[in-house]
């Protein structure tokens, strides 16, 4: 499980960095989203991935705390997903406004020349 998760995090990070270095704004936004997903998976993985382990305590008593998973990374990831969605929507609006003003979607506002 850890090997698959770390391979997924590495793939998302590499793809995100590659897209961040591209000259078009839309690719940069997708790269930021992929990096956000990689960080979310990393935080989620640090919270002890367990199958059938509730993140809340039983009302009958505490018992053994090793049976429970940590709820804080789950709450952080859920919050990060919502904030990431809002930031992506904001970036897309800024992209559309920039394209309307400059007529291009390049990051620096200029078309690349084929010299």
Swiss-Prot record:
GO cellular component: plasma membrane
Keywords: Antiport, Cell membrane, Hydrogen ion transport, Ion transport, Membrane, Potassium, Potassium transport, Transmembrane, Transmembrane helix, Transport
One Gene Ontology term of the molecular function aspect: monoatomic cation transmembrane transporter activity
GO BP field: potassium ion transport; proton transmembrane transport
Xref: InterPro entries: CPA3_antiporter_subunitC, Mnh_C1_su, NUOK/Mnh_C1-like
Compartments, as annotated in UniProt: Cell membrane
Listed transmembrane segments: 4-21, 28-47, 75-97
Recorded topology in the membrane: Multi-pass membrane protein
Family of the protein in this entry: Belongs to the CPA3 antiporters (TC 2.A.63) subunit C family.
Quaternary structure (record): May form a hetero-oligomeric complex that consists of six subunits: PhaAB, PhaC, PhaD, PhaE, PhaF and PhaG.
Its biological purpose: Part of a K(+) efflux system which is required for the adaptation of R.meliloti to alkaline pH as well as for the infection process during symbiotic nodule development.
Protein name listed in UniProt: Probable K(+)/H(+) antiporter subunit C
Lineage: Bacteria, Pseudomonadati, Pseudomonadota, Alphaproteobacteria, Hyphomicrobiales
């Amino acid at each position: 499980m850890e090997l698959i998760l770390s391979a997924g995090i590495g793939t998302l990070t590499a793809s995100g960095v590659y897209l961040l270095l591209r000259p078009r704004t839309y690719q940069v936004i997708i790269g930021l989203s992929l990096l956000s997903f990689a960080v979310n998976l990393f935080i989620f993985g640090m919270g002890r991935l367990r199958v059938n382990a509730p993140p809340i305590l039983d009302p009958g008593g505490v018992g053994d705390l090793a049976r429970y998973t940590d709820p804080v990374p789950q709450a952080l990831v859920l919050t990060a997903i919502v904030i990431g969605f809002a930031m992506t929507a904001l970036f897309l609006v800024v992209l559309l406004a920039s394209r309307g003003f400059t007529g291009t979607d390049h990051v620096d506002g200029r078309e690349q020349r084929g010299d």
